[in-house]
Amino acid sequence: MSLACSRSLFFMAFTAGILALGASYYLEYAVGLVPCSLCLVQRLFMSVLTLCCGLAAVHGPQRVGLSLYWMVTLLSSLGGTTAAWRQVLFQSDSLQELAHCAPNPEEMFSSLPWLCALMRMFNDTADCAELSWTLFDLSIPEWSLLFFVGMSILAVYQLLRQVWMALQRPLSGQPSHPALVRD
């Protein structure tokens, strides 16, 4: 029962990620919105999250594999939450305080080491502070933040559930705590 439940949760998270990525590409190519550097970072984390959930749904791992997949999901959703939160903060700042020239991601990654390029993408730029599109009075980074926070909550809940199940039924078949002998 637990395996089927985990596979369906991974499949639902995979489907939500595909829909979110599809919406971002639709807004870029059909509507004409140009993504800023933080949007590209959020897409990267969302792609990792979606790929991880898709692999887990197909793979159907057991106890240790489930924990690893949920951990990767949690880490990628926390990275996306950080990028989305940073962009939401940029949108609340005044544009005069932000740098006016946004770094080109292709040039940065070709000329700088990866870590330096990622750090530079988190600098204040006016491109990331523009409110170009809203739905229900929420901007794209706010929707992205809601998605990543939801995925983080799901991953934390599933990891805590895995820990609880491991305490109740360890791999050896013996309870790990005397209070759980009643089982």
Swiss-Prot record:
Entry keyword annotation includes Nucleotide-binding: no
Main location group: membrane
Domain of life: Bacteria
Spans within the Periplasmic topological domain: 27-44, 86-142
Segments on the Cytoplasmic side according to the record's topology features: 1-9, 62-68, 162-183
GO CC annotations, alphabetized: plasma membrane
Disulfide bonds: C36-C39, C101-C128
InterPro entries linked to this entry: DiS_bond_form_DsbB/BdbC (IPR003752), Disulphide_bond_form_DsbB (IPR022920), DsbB (IPR050183), DsbB-like_sf (IPR023380)
Localisation: Cell inner membrane
Topology of the protein relative to the lipid bilayer: Multi-pass membrane protein
Record carries keyword Transmembrane helix: yes
Transmembrane segments annotated in the record for this chain: 10-26, 45-61, 69-85, 143-161
Database matches in Pfam families: DsbB
GO molecular function: electron transfer activity; protein-disulfide reductase activity
Keywords: Cell inner membrane, Cell membrane, Chaperone, Disulfide bond, Electron transport, Membrane, Oxidoreductase, Redox-active center, Transmembrane, Transmembrane helix, Transport
Signal peptide positions on this chain: none
One of the GO BP terms on file: protein folding
Family from the record: Belongs to the DsbB family.
Protein's job: Required for disulfide bond formation in some periplasmic proteins. Acts by oxidizing the DsbA protein.
Record-linked PANTHER family: DISULFIDE BOND FORMATION PROTEIN B
Protein name per Swiss-Prot or TrEMBL: Disulfide bond formation protein B 2
